[in-house]
């Protein structure tokens, strides 16, 4: 495993730890998810470039499209929750609260 792969995997794991630690605010969770998706994109692009697997050239682009859709839906949800409740706490998204 090369140093670049280790750095990308470390970035992914740090984003995952950030998602697990700072999950009370929706904005922090969305930023950590975006970091995870970007590190997966770079890892997929590097893997395809190193292996010369031409059939999978579109996989990083498809991953980037899904990341953009996830970010757009997350920001729309953030705007809706902050307009409704005034805060961006994730606990406001739970509809089963008493």
From Swiss-Prot:
The gene is MT-ND4L. Core subunit of respiratory chain NADH dehydrogenase (Complex I) which is composed of 45 different subunits. Disulfide bonds: none annotated. InterPro entries: NADH_UbQ_OxRdtase_chain4L/K, NUOK/Mnh_C1-like. It is a multi-pass membrane protein. Its EC number is 7.1.1.2. The keyword Transcription regulation does not apply. It comes from Eschrichtius robustus (California gray whale). This is NADH-ubiquinone oxidoreductase chain 4L. Keywords: Electron transport, Membrane, Mitochondrion, Mitochondrion inner membrane, NAD, Respiratory chain, Translocase, Transmembrane, Transmembrane helix, Transport, Ubiquinone. The chain crosses the membrane at residues 1-21, 29-49, 61-81. The keyword Translocase applies. Core subunit of the mitochondrial membrane respiratory chain NADH dehydrogenase (Complex I) which catalyzes electron transfer from NADH through the respiratory chain, using ubiquinone as an electron acceptor. Part of the enzyme membrane arm which is embedded in the lipid bilayer and involved in proton translocation. It is found in: Mitochondrion inner membrane. Belongs to the complex I subunit 4L family. GO terms for biological process: ATP synthesis coupled electron transport. Gene3D superfamilies: 1.10.287.3510. One of its GO terms (cellular component) is mitochondrial inner membrane. Its main location: mitochondrion. GO terms for molecular function: NADH dehydrogenase (ubiquinone) activity. It catalyses: a ubiquinone + NADH + 5 H(+)(in) = a ubiquinol + NAD(+) + 4 H(+)(out).
